[in-house]
Amino acid sequence: MPASFQSFSATTSRPWGRWILLVLGLLLMAALAWLKWGLDPWLRRKLEQQARTQTHGQYTLTVASLRTHLLSRSLHLGGVALRPATPTTADTLPRLTARLASLDLSGVGLLALLRGRTVPIDSLTLDSLRLDVAALARRPAPHPSRPLYQQRPLQLGYLALRHAGGRFGPATKPVGELADGTVSARDVLFTSAGATDTQRLAFAASWRALLRGPVGRLGGHTIKAQAVDFASAQQFLGIDSLHITPPAPGQGKPGAVRVLFTMPHAQLRGLRAAAWQHQGRLRADSLRLSTPHLTFWPPAQAPPPLWKLLAPVFKRADVRRVAIADGYLAVAGVDEAPAVRHLYGVATELRIDSLSQQAAARRVLYARTWVGHTGRLTATLFPPLYPTSIEHAFLNTNQQALRLTELALRPTIGPAQLNQYKGYQSTQLTAHIDEMRAEGFDFQLLSANSHVRIARVTAERPYLLARSDGRGPINHQPSIISPEAMRHLRAHLDVRRLDLRNGTIEASYRSASTPLVGTFGIAQLNATLYNVSNDPSRMSLAHPLTGTATGYLQGQCRAEVHLTTSLLDPQGRQHLRGSFGPAPFSLLNPMLKPTRLISFKSGQAQGIDFEEYVDREHIIGTVRARYSDLRINFLGYKGDEVKKTFFGRIKSGLANVVIRDQNPRPDGRVVTGDIQTPRELEFSTFTAWRQGLIVGFLHNVGIPKKLASKYGEADGGTPLPAPTDAPSRPATTADTPPRTQEPP
């Protein structure tokens, strides 16, 4: 090639190269200028436009400031607000407003972002978020898109949400509110793999949350707490100052349960939150409830079991240890008003699911064992008549032991007022037991089937005061104080042995004839019953209830009684036999003199043996009394005192001629009295026993059978006492013995 041609080519190519380099430089400078001054506005407009596009113009997104830093791969947004653009929104969109003070992204993987891969991000921090959701979407979108973690996969090293708050529901009556919250997460894998990773909780390796002032409303109840603290790495969940308040009277669903609950502290430790999310199984090492106070109004219909109520929350819950410290439990809205104070309890291996309630699970209230004690327990029996209380209760299901102390039942009205309240004669009761122990208590059977099975029950120093007023009609309904009444219990009651130790029974009676009150007592009562059961597999005529009791009548006369009966016998058959030791007949005067206007002038019993056979129709048997010098006086009542009268002296003389003054007779023959009298089902079994003894004794001393039977039967009743009637007063006679024990 000629030299002139080569020189021409070199000179013509150099200007083009310069121009290309110049253009490239200008383009680079323009790109850098656009990245510095144009990228941020473009991104801001793009975000705002994308929000309008995806919501079909129903929402407006505004971003007050947006700054990018490409070298540090960071992004900052400030003053972000999302608001509805129209008065109403489509039913496929929620109705909400959101305000965010700032959003900071750092360490964004730009290359992965451009390639459409999982974008790594070092940290994402949102500050001062306020989210108000007025309503959720009423129906799903017709063409639902893929989940966001599939559209925009991310991997965040650190995620933080600071000073968040908001409201859910209508502004006038929100369903949920949050005053302030701080949430953070580490190692967040926002991808399909992260969603299915069973070791992660909501895409993250760990979460930390502190919520202050959360408030929720459910079923008309308001639920709020001072703070909720959650840390998945430490497996911890804590709640401070939890309050649940019921709806106001007249509000809420009629017949639904109402709850009033407060608890200063609750701590759940060892919580496997990831297993809860992926398996629906709540597992934890311990749960401690500090000073929980629960008052609830039971629903009109029995609620479903606990596991079914909690099924939307978890399929199964396992907690190794549950501790309750200084709890309070009360049932309101019922006249009985039961309440438990100062409740302390520890449960082990708590499990809540459908299988744990079955009898084969051998659990007590979903737990393997319970150990605890309480303070005072109160309730009202036959409200408002009998407030009852138990001072302390001690429970150990593993040892099958229950101990109750200071059991008390106290009436609120007197015997005459009780008759007026019920409309017929009724016995007023006062009771106290120093201590009651149950050994071999099958708590698992009680929890599974509501059946009671106990090896031994012991009542220490029981005291019973029975006060009656004879003014009023007789209640002709069958008495429930009878062995055969056990047949009607729905649940099984099975006590292998029942012991009463050093008990006291006192009775007082005011007849219709005088305002004086007669008294009678049994001291040092010791009784043992075997096979107290209405379980058909335990109770039969071949295996009946048997028992023995000893005591001292009026503190003087030793008595011994043996009982045999089947609690499932439809005929109510009972066999009672016993004996009374030496005693003067005058010990009966404190009861007979003021109420029957009869007294024993003299007489000494060497011993009385009796045997009774009782069923639902008859009382039969024999009484054999050995006595001497028997004399009685018929008295009258005049001038507020019991005294001898002219007609009383005549009746006394005739009676002392008729009755046998001694037995054995002078010829050595021992006379036996027969018991033949109808059973009056409207009276208790104890009244039937007493009726048989009276009839047999009267016949034994010479009263004809028919007259003795008639005298032993109850009278037909009288009109009820008027509210202005003079109150009963104790009879003050020389025969009145001192009280064997003051009522507690």
Model-derived segments and their meaning:
Residues 60-138, 145-181, 186-242, 247-298, ...:
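Flexible beta-edge/linker motif
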Residues 2-56, 173-182, 344:
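N-terminal type II signal-anchor transmembrane helix
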Residues 183-185, 196-207, 302-307, 341-355, ...:
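Beta-propeller and related beta-repeat scaffolds in trafficking/envelope systems
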Residues 2-21, 562-566, 572, 579, ...:
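Extended terminal
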Residues 415-417, 474-481:
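Short, charged/polar, low-complexity loop and linker segments
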Residues 145-169, 307-335, 360, 373-377, ...:
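Solvent-exposed beta-strand/coil patches in large extracellular/periplasmic or lumenal scaffold regions
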Residues 101, 181, 264, 285, ...:
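Hydrophobic residues positioned within well-ordered beta-strands of beta-sheet architectures
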